[in-house]
Amino acid sequence: VVVSGGRGTEGDFTAIEALADQIPNTAVGSSRAAVNEGWRPHDDQVGQTGNKIAPELYIPCGISGAVQHMVGCKGSENILAINTDPEAAIMQKADYAIVADLHETVPAIADELDARGHAE
């Protein structure tokens, strides 16, 4: 599993990291925009000029889904996108899409997983 954040995080990856902590063997990724803003290191970047990933589940949060980003995650078996914009490209490419504010939704998912004891 890879949980990534983009411009929609507004630089706050706390919720992204908390969700990743609740799912065993999960990595944190980011969009190029987040790297360019200085919010994440280049090593976290998913995309054409970053990492090519192929997890069972990819959870992009606040990522628009630019073509360059989609090149990096096209090997994902399932994409569960969380974005406030239902028309964002990532939402059209996702297997599952949640139209919501990641700052509310991602912590709620992490809290629910924690309550169910999913963390290792």
How would you name each of these model-derived features?
Residues V1-E120:
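N-terminal glycine-rich FAD/FM-binding segment characteristic of electron-transfer flavoproteins
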